[in-house]
Amino acid sequence: MTIARRPSCHAVENSIGLAAPAEAVFDYVTDVRREREWNPQLREAEKLTPGPVGVGTRYRVRFGRGVGAAIIENTAFDRPRGWSAVSTSRRLDVRFRGQVTGLPGGCQLGVQTELSPRGALRVFSPVLRQLMRRSWDKDLAAIKAIIER
């Protein structure tokens, strides 16, 4: 999967190499119910749609740090290469793309997060972008530690 759209100035891109098969990494990171294992900001995640994870899968989630409740929906799903999702909340909408590239001995996990803050939160866009970049660096390191156990 390639990222066709050019990211806005509010987009954050992060990546990490993993010593694990692309399929295992993809399956782990695309199931939002498992995100609490590596994202300390996620408090709750409930899958709202029946069946396997794929396009149209929706989750109700609750984050800490002022984001609160959100609905996440997968908008593209190309196992094990890439996926896209949107998250809608009262204060912040997020467009997300993930890409898993197979490499000798493992894979590369890349994520792109595009933030669309609402209302007064818009003035904090540069700060939000920096927080998101740091948060993804920590989250990717946690994913790596879990996957490579």
Enumerate the language-model features and the residues they cover.
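Hydrophobic ligand-binding cavity/cleft-lining segments
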Residues: M1-T49
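Glycine-centered tight beta-turn/hairpin loop motif at sheet-sheet or coil-to-beta transitions
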Residues: C9, R65-V67, R91-D93
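Short beta-edge strand/loop motif at the mouth of beta-sheet-based domains
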Residues: E13, R33-A69, F77-G82
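Hydrophobic/aromatic beta-strand elements that line small-molecule binding cavities or substrate pockets
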Residues: N14-I16, K47, V61, A70-A76, ...
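A short, structured loop/turn motif at beta-sheet edges
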Residues: A19-E23, P50, T75-P80, Q99-Q108, ...
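Hydrophobic pocket/interface hotspot
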Residues: A24-V29, E35, Y59, N74, ...
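Beta-strand/loop substructures that line and gate deep hydrophobic ligand-binding cavities in soluble
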Residues: S84-K138, I143-A145
